Amino acid sequence: MSYSNGNINCDIMPTISEDGVDNGGPIDEPSDRDNIEQLMMNMLEDRDKLQEQLENYKVQLENAGLRTKEVEKERDMMKRQFEVHTQNLPQELQTMTRELCLLKEQLLEKDEEIVELKAERNNTRLLLEHLECLVSRHERSLRMTVMKRQAQNHAGVSSEVEVLKALKSLFEHHKALDEKVRERLRVAMERVATLEEELSTKGDENSSLKARIATYAAEAEEAMASNAPINGSISSESANRLIEMQEALERMKTELANSLKQSTEITTRNAELEDQLTEDAREKHAAQESIVRLKNQICELDAQRTDQETRITTFESRFLTAQRESTCIRDLNDKLEHQLANKDAAVRLNEEKVHSLQERLELAEKQLAQSLKKAESLPSVEAELQQRMEALTAAEQKSVSAEERIQRLDRNIQELSAELERAVQRERMNEEHSQRLSSTVDKLLSESNDRLQLHLKERMQALDDKNRLTQQLDGTKKIYDQAERIKDRLQRDNESLRQEIEALRQQLYNARTAQFQSRMHAIPFTHAQNIVQQQPQASIAQQSAYQMYKQQPAQQYQTVGMRRPNKGRISALQDDPNKVQTLNEQEWDRLQQAHVLANVQQAFSSSPSLADVGQSTLPRPNTAVQHQQDDMMNSGMGMPSGMQGGMQGGMGGGQDAQMLASMLQDRLDAINTEIRLIQQEKHHAERVAEQLERSSREFYDDQGISTRSSPRASPQLDNMRQHKYNTLPANVSGDRRYDIYGNPQFVDDRMVRDLDYEPRRGYNQFDEMQYERDRMSPASSVASSTDGVLGGKKKRSNSSSGLKTLGRFFNKKKNSSSDLFKRNGDYSDGEQSGTEGNQKADYDRRKKKKHELLEEAMKARTPFALWNGPTVVAWLELWVGMPAWYVAACRANVKSGAIMSALSDQEIQKEIGISNPLHRLKLRLAIQEMVSLTSPSAPRTARLTLAFGDMNHEYIGNDWLPCLGLAQYRSAFMECLLDARMLEHLSKRDLRTHLRMVDTFHRTSLQYGIMCLKKVNYDKKVLADRRKACDNINTDLLVWSNERVQRWVEEIGLGVFSRNLVDSGIHGALIALDETFDASAFAYALQIGSQDVPNRQLLEKKFIGLVNDHRQQSDPHPRSGSSRKNDSIAKSYEFHLYT
């Protein structure tokens, strides 16, 4: 409308400016008229145009009215459709939300059911697996026992075998069912997850549709509310909006249809899931029923097994009773046979008597006939005959009674033989039955034992191979490094000796030229007087020096094999330059230099002319060397006075130059021999290195040269050399050796000599004098204070009474060196050439030195952490009693007590190679004991006898176990090196596995034996004295041995049964301390039959008297039996007492 008004204004408004009349000049009248006409014409034309436009607008209005009517009709129609569609929409949304809530609740319930089904399925699976394991484990044994037990009843065997087969098939069926159910559950869970995702998406779409419908409804309401006049633009906008609303309604229709379809699909899927869940529940119910049936079958099998076990126990008891009855019957049979033999002898005697009486009767009849013939009329003869006839009738009656007795005895013997045959038949049947039972049990046990032994052998073989390879590698490395050090040291010695030879040759040349010049010139008179005055002293000194010089090569080279003298600590310092020289070692170096200079100066100053010439020809030593020489000459080293006088007076004394030349020539010969020996040693070292490279995987042994941790090694300790795992004694040849595991090794003698090669130590007088002169270095340890000083005094430290006792122990050990030599022959040093007597003397000296090391360390109360390597090795060998291979491994790996005390159980196994846990326990307990003994802050222990080593593993195995009646375990105890300090630390597992003590009663016997040792404070002497005191008196039952109990049984008149106590584990401590061990248990151990009532009553009477006397003495306040039993059980480790 605004557009049409604008056009009207444009058409009506003239283009003539109205202000022109006022502003212009005067207008003429004709122009005014023309203008008016023109104006009228224009107005008419404008009116025509306006009418046309009005008609056009009327037409347009009519058209618009028609359009609006049509639009209103369409709007009404759309509104009715919208109302139709939206009329049921809120109810459907509510129903859909309720259905969604129900579906969610159902899904949660199904999830819970699924979780429960999973748990139950897992439980059933575990139960089935357990049942399968049980059946597979016991199938063979059950089948064998069933076949043996019911060999005649084939129906029972087949039924049980079928039960086993059915169980197996049931297991397989349930496995397959589990797999199927698991697969179905996985598929159903996947479908539920997808459906939940679809539901969430559809819910989002429904919410968006609801929002759109709400917006469209609001717009429609706004459109209906606004009934304002509608022009062309409004009608177009409403038309567009209606079109959009129609499209949106179409989309909503399609989306609602799709959502309905999806909801129907979801309901169908839920129905399917419910069906699957019901099927799973039915399968679960069936599985539970099968499990119940299996449980019932298992209970039946357990009942059958318990029934079989009870039957086996009853059979065993019957067998034992039958065995005891058979022994009793045998004893009765022996008695009856003995009585029968006596009766036979009596019958023979009676027969002989009857025969003699018949002979006498015949003689009497003959005499009677003769007498009747001679004197029939004599009454006295008749009376006499009458008496003789009466005697004969009495003899006949006696013979008849003897025959009757013989017949009765025959009948009794026949009855007893019949009873004996019946008893033998019963015994044979019992033996056959027990043999069948024992064969089945033995087969089962042997099969399991074979499997365990095979597995154990494989593990032990792998472990042994690993340990052997590591030890071979370590030993080879050490020997190779040692050979390299020997080679370097020999090269250095060779070079130094070559330089010394060159210097001596130069000095000899200078001496000879000086001698030649002295002969060319005259000798001054004043000098000759000095020669006359000093000649005797110089000659004596020269002779003594010459003798000493001559003795030195003899001392040095009298050893076998022409080996050069060992330099002891100096060679060790040359091998290892990192070691610190002490003050005494530095003085010893200076002393050697001064000794060489003194020898050369003494040789050069022997002639009178050489004193003057030597000052010009010989190079003077520096002042430091001169002071060292003066110190050596004046320090009182112990040189002979003649030698000192010769060295002091030789500067001005005269002597034949030939003596000087011979001395120098001897010195050169000795140096040449030194050079040859050094070359020989170098050759040995090279050959050893080559052989070690070739045989590094076949031969391993300890290095031949061992360094010392003390600053000065004594001669005995320097000569002590031991191969790491050599177990041969010193008097056995080196052709055959044994490795650590006892396997023989055949080694070439040449290789043994090369590996054992060590330059021996040659003692000259300067060595001994220096040892007397030197004081102990501050760096030396207390344990090595006895090394070096051969005759020096030792300081006695004030120690406690316990350590004084330890000193007496080691003094006592020194007196019994021969016994130690016999017992510890495996610990001897490496094989050396020489006689057997010299080897034993060297061994005794080495043992004495080890005892001195330990005694000195204990007297000085040196803490165990400060002990050095040799003292720790001596302690392991003499105190702990470890085998030679463990001692050698400790010598190679442990250099101090601190290292030893810091070793853990794993490090002991890895570094020292102790694989047996009881051996490691022995070492750890010994270390703890020594640390507590030597610690200054630790209190004194009351059980010092443990430390003395009196109850070592040899005493435990050879003496103590037989006294307990457990001699059958001696080999296991000796293999485990079990000593007294280990007894309280044994567990039940150690007794069963390592000591092979499976019998519960034997373990109980061992426990009460340990309690007896506790009561005597582990004192072997006290125990022996108490046993000796009660040897012939029935007192002190606590210390009775198994043999003493047997003698007591013989004393009470039951000697027939005493042999049954051998290896039974019955001793005095068990009888005295175990209150559950009564007379019936003792009779059972003695194998006295239950029908032998008199012997049982006798044993019970004597046993009660013996035990009551002891228990009244030991326990004045008796308690109840249960409390005493609990106290006895609650000891250091658990035992099941004998019942």
From Swiss-Prot:
Entry comment describing in which tissues the protein is expressed: Detected in vulval muscle and other cells near the vulva; in neurons located in the lateral ganglion, posterior ganglion, ventral cord and lateral body; and in pharyngeal and body wall muscle cells.
Domain (SAM): residue spans on this chain: 867-933, 952-1016, 1040-1109
Record Gene3D superfamilies: Transcription Factor, Ets-1
SUPFAM superfamilies hit by this protein: SAM/Pointed domain, Tropomyosin
A Gene Ontology BP annotation from the UniProt entry: axo-dendritic transport
Listed InterPro entries: Liprin (IPR029515), Liprin-alpha_SAM_rpt_1 (IPR037620), Liprin-alpha_SAM_rpt_2 (IPR037621), Liprin-alpha_SAM_rpt_3 (IPR037622), SAM (IPR001660), SAM/pointed_sf (IPR013761)
Keywords recorded for this protein, A-Z: Coiled coil, Repeat, Synapse
Superkingdom in the source lineage: Eukaryota
Any one GO CC term of the record: axon
UniProt region (Disordered), positions on chain: 700-720, 764-847
Residue runs in coiled coils: 30-144, 172-298, 329-517, 655-701
Molecular function in Gene Ontology: cytoskeletal motor activator activity; kinesin binding; protein homodimerization activity; signaling receptor complex adaptor activity
Localization terms from the record: Synapse
Feature: compositional bias, Polar residues: 704-719, 778-787
Entry similarity comment: Belongs to the liprin family. Liprin-alpha subfamily.
Function: May play a role in regulating the structure of the neuronal region, called the active zone, from which synaptic vesicles send neurotransmitter signals across the synapse. This may be in association with the liprin-beta protein hlb-1.
The name this protein goes by in its record: Liprin-alpha
Gene assigned in the entry: syd-2
